[in-house]
Amino acid sequence: MKRGSGTVDGVKDTKQVNQTKQVIPIRCEGVAVILLKKNLDQYHVLMLKRASRMLHNEWCYIGGGIEMGEKAWEAALREIREETGITEVRLYSANQFEQYYSPMEDYTYTAPVFVGYVDESQPVQLNHEHSDYQWMTFDEAKENAALPGIDHILDFVEKHFAKKAPSKWLRIDGKI
């Protein structure tokens, strides 16, 4: 290595790169959950209308923060229970991540996506975060989704969780 060249055998010294470029943090502080219910041989997606200030009156799927000491899948089960009152669900990791950039705080938010299958008899009881809910087809959910990118996640879930059985390796055996 030549003194001051910033390379070792042609590879940039990462310390020097970090001193010359701005790093934007990536935060994984929450989870996203897509609940599926079969109706007449077709899966429907639970979409919730937001009542809070953020994304007010927009349709979204379940999501929320991960509490201190909690695993992501535990947060997913808790958010399902808190936002919908649903207590019986077969949960899977979607092996996907929801992500967006926050210009106000200059960071990238990322959240693991989970998929839950619920029995058609499970009632939905909304909490204060939502004003309405609908079980939508995948096309309806994509059309009504609040943010760009959600359609890609819904396409993935439809392909790998609705049109065929999910991989047994993605099953999560936790309890609500």
Give the label of every model feature segment.
Residues G4-S5, V11:
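Intrinsic disorder/low-complexity segments enriched in small, polar and charged residues
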Residues T14-V45:
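Conserved N-terminal beta-strand and adjoining loop/helix that marks the start
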Residues I26-C28, L40, M54, D106-Y109, ...:
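A generic fold-level signal
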Residues R27, G85-Q122:
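Active-site segment of metal-dependent pyrophosphate-handling enzymes
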Residues L35-K37, K49, V113-Y117, T137:
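Short, well-ordered beta-strand micro-motif
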Residues Q42-E82:
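Conserved Nudix-box catalytic region and its N-terminal flanking loop in Nudix hydrolases
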Residues M54-H56, N127-I176:
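Nudix hydrolase/Nudix homology domain
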Residues C60, T108, W135:
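Short aromatic/basic micro-patch
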